[in-house]
Amino acid sequence: MTSSNFPKAERLLRRPEFLQFNEGASKLHTQYFLVLLKPNEGTGTRVGFTVSKKVGNAVVRNSIKRRLREFYRQNKSLFISADINIVAKKGADVLDFHQISTELAAAFGRLRKKYA
């Protein structure tokens, strides 16, 4: 059974880790999210979340990040072994958890087919 936690080893935490997506990352656009994917050197899946001030105030941004973390925690099996950054687009603040899950599950299904 897959562990349902989100340890630091599975997170992108530092600025240089996020800047690596500027060059050579694969992009997948959905209506409310941009998924950036870059293969890593065998370190497993690492995930980061970016929600800019364009999306909303701090309360809204933190709420979206909590929902994204929960989606990752519950759906680790959908994620391929790579560095992944999920960027929320303007308008993502109106989504509830179920809508986020549906949209991202479809996106990661497409990524699995592409990189399988």
Swiss-Prot record:
GO terms in the biological process aspect are: tRNA 5'-leader removal
* Annotated GO MF terms: 3'-tRNA processing endoribonuclease activity; ribonuclease P activity; tRNA binding
Q: Which domain of life is it from?
A: Bacteria
The UniProt keyword set, sorted, is: Endonuclease, Hydrolase, Nuclease, RNA-binding, tRNA processing
Q: Which GO terms describe its cellular component?
A: ribonuclease P complex
InterPro entries, A to Z: Ribosomal_Su5_D2-typ_SF, Ribsml_uS5_D2-typ_fold_subgr, RNase_P
EC number from the UniProt entry? 3.1.26.5
- Reaction equation(s) it catalyzes: Endonucleolytic cleavage of RNA, removing 5'-extranucleotides from tRNA precursor
Instruction: Respond yes or no to whether keyword RNA-binding is given for this record.
Output: yes
Similarity-based family: Belongs to the RnpA family.
Function in brief: RNaseP catalyzes the removal of the 5'-leader sequence from pre-tRNA to produce the mature 5'-terminus. It can also cleave other RNA substrates such as 4.5S RNA. The protein component plays an auxiliary but essential role in vivo by binding to the 5'-leader sequence and broadening the substrate specificity of the ribozyme.
Question: How would you summarize the oligomeric state and partners of this protein?
Answer: Consists of a catalytic RNA component (M1 or rnpB) and a protein subunit.
Name listed for the protein in its UniProt record: Ribonuclease P protein component
Origin organism is Citrifermentans bemidjiense (strain ATCC BAA-1014 / DSM 16622 / JCM 12645 / Bem) (Geobacter bemidjiensis)
